[in-house]
Regions:
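C-terminal segments of enzyme domains that contribute to small-molecule binding surfaces
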Residues: 2-16, 20, 71-92, 100, ...
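Left-handed beta-helix
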Residues: 15, 20-21, 26-27, 32-33, ...
Length: 179
């Protein structure tokens, strides 16, 4: 795995967190307990902080970055990801906040200042435009992403289950099993 410092700040990994050897995790990045970072992911906390909560996963070929502080936005946009979050393959996250139990579908893009409340699904290929707030309990789809419908109770239960399944899978990889 490539855990690299930036300006003398090295990423921190919580207990049981796992980073694939092909991934790059750079700078001010904190991974919570049992979080996982999958092949060919880039997480770059150079000009702001990135926090990824417990049991959350960032899947293959995704990019997570931040925005620097600037006039009119003294804090910039960190990227903050809650617990039990599933970030699908080839997702781009930039300077956004994602609360707990969220699924961001394959190929989606989430931009600066976006807030995704807990218990949300973002459909594959969606574009969440800057500053948008996605309310809890709904599926959002499209470009730009729009509220489509309420999540079913089964869908709400599926998100933390997927996060737990990825914890089990990352443990198998970490322990040398590839089946």
């Amino acid at each position: 795995m490539a855990i690299r410092p930036y300006l003398d700040v090295t990423p921190t990994l919580g207990p049981g967190a796992w980073v694939d050897e092909t991934a790059q995790v750079i700078g001010r990045v904190e991974l919570g307990a049992d979080a996982s970072v999958w092949p060919f992911v880039l997480i770059r906390g150079d000009v702001n902080v990135i926090r990824i909560g417990a049991r959350s996963n960032v899947q293959d070929a995704s990019i997570v970055h931040v925005s620097r502080p600037h006039a009119g936005n003294e804090a910039g946009w960190p990227t903050l990801i809650g617990e039990d979050v599933v970030i699908g393959h080839k997702v781009a996250l930039h300077g956004c906040t994602i609360h707990d139990r969220v699924l961001v579908g394959i190929g989606s893009i989430v931009l600066d200042g976006v807030v995704i409340e807990s218990d949300v699904m973002v459909g594959a290929g969606s574009l969440v435009t800057p500053g948008k707030r996605l309310e809890s309990g709904y599926l959002y789809v499209g470009s730009p992403a729009r509220r489509s419908r309420e999540l079913t109770s089964e869908e709400r239960a599926r998100i933390p289950k997927m996060a737990r399944d990825y914890v089990t899978l990352q443990r198998a990889y970490r322990d040398g099993g590839h089946s």
